[in-house]
UniProtKB/Swiss-Prot annotation:
Keywords linked to the UniProt accession: Cell cycle, Cell division, Coiled coil, Cytoplasm, DNA-binding
Protein name: Nucleoid occlusion factor SlmA
UniProt similarity note: Belongs to the nucleoid occlusion factor SlmA family.
Organism of this sequence: Sodalis glossinidius (strain morsitans)
Annotated PANTHER family: HTH-TYPE TRANSCRIPTIONAL REGULATOR RUTR (PTHR30055), NUCLEOID OCCLUSION FACTOR SLMA (PTHR30055:SF183)
């Protein structure tokens, strides 16, 4: 029984990896169909539906992976790092680095791969960005408690500016067909971002 569960889990992961790979190699102008996905995995469409009730559920699973990966690592950063600017820098690098290592998933994160899918999926991505923005805002607000110094500008404005920078870098990554890496020149850009915070 355990072996059957492992086989099923492995097949599910194989399907999700194939979908992510197809998103990476696709220009996003055409919908990825279950027929194309099944052919890519080497199974029938019926076999796909034994593992996922719909293509929407496949995208849900990929979004869950993105959420779990980012939020759990943000929590680790907040646990391990105490200095505000280091926390912000590491969170931004996490988001940009995750996208860089997962180009197919970046198409989901930018909404590019969701154009032909259910609106609910875009809503989930919007919620993910809202959660990240809340975390950034909290880090900014905690500066006064941790370091005895507050930012001059409103923390909500600063958090949205930092997130907008990341979203812009992810969009550029997708637009350039993954040639312009999100982390490219980050160390040169970071002082510019810090200057905006003061």
């Amino acid at each position: 029984m355990a072996e059957k569960e492992n086989t099923k889990r492995n097949r599910r992961e194989e399907i999700l990896q194939a979908l992510a790979q197809m998103l990476e190699s696709s220009d996003g102008s055409q919908r990825i169909t279950t027929a194309k996905l099944a052919a890519n995995v080497g199974v029938s469409e019926a076999a796909l539906y034994r593992h996922f009730p719909s293509k929407t559920r496949m995208f849900d699973s990929l979004i869950e992976f993105i959420e779990d990966s980012l939020i759990s690592r943000i929590n680790l950063i907040l646990q391990d790092e105490k200095e505000t600017l280091n926390r912000l820098r590491l969170i931004l690098l996490l988001l940009l680095g995750f996208a860089e290592r997962n180009p197919g998933l970046t198409r989901i994160m930018t909404g590019h791969a969701l154009m032909f899918e259910q609106d609910r999926l875009q809503g989930r991505i919007n919620q993910l960005y809202e959660r990240i923005e809340v975390q950034l805002r909290q880090v900014l607000r905690e500066r006064k408690l941790r370091e005895g110094e507050a930012f001059e500008l409103d923390e909500s404005l600063l958090a949205s500016q930092l997130l907008a920078f990341c979203e812009g870098m992810l969009s550029r990554f997708v637009r350039t067909e993954f040639k312009y890496r999100p982390t490219q020149e980050f160390e040169l850009r970071w002082p510019l971002l810090v200057a905006q915070l003061h």
